[in-house]
Amino acid sequence: RNIGGVDPRVLVSKRVKVGYDVPVRDGKPAQEALNGVIGAMAIHLQSAADRKNVLPIENLYVDIGAKDKDEALAKAPEGTPITFATPSTPIGDGCLLCKAGDDRVGCYNLLRLLHADVTCDTWFAFTCQEEVGSRGAYGAAFRIQPDVALILEGTTANDAGEQDETRKVCRLGKGVAVSFMDKASIAQPELFAELLRLAEGSGIAHQVKMAVAGGNDSGPIQRTGCGAKVCVLSVPCRYIHSPSTVLCLEDVEAQYLLAKAYLTR
């Protein structure tokens, strides 16, 4: 089954890891994740009609080199998690090709912000399962009951190729994208304006996200308990929901600098 919004068009022949790397623990030996590849019926065996259609996930399988079904289930029982095995690679001039830029880039900058000299009581929540209903955000917001929440994430750039200008949500290399609204939340107007003022006054590259689409952890956080002022700071990412995302390192730095400027103001 698909956990999240992975694009089924890009799955066939992708290398994956099955299970987790587990270190030595309580006297038990270390365990390494299995290598695998996503397979499907060979194209020369498909009908002409089938070749024109995207194969549904139900028609795909993961090949771990097992000789039969029993061996496969012994090594990877039903429910074993599968992740893409995409290495992080610098490309172009200051860009990075990696998996899960949306939203691990936000986790990276949260780790950096842990060292900032913040001027207010600050909690750092590394939430899980955003792609399947922001489940981690609900628990974190219920526990913390924040007054203000900045959501650090990655978002679709859609700026490559011959796209209509109205469909270019944000652009790589133009700075952190600040959202005024999406399908999950509406940014608190004063907070949105303050972040833009901080960015302009500090010379931090920034842009306003130009599409009211998608959703993220801002929705549950804004509506949990007594509610919170929220605003989303996003790093533009190309090809989200795929094994390979592309982001600009200058945009990553801009997200960090703007969040830091707000927390240390």
Task: Go through each PLM region and give its residues.
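N-terminal hydrophobic/helix-forming segments and targeting peptides
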Residues: 1-265
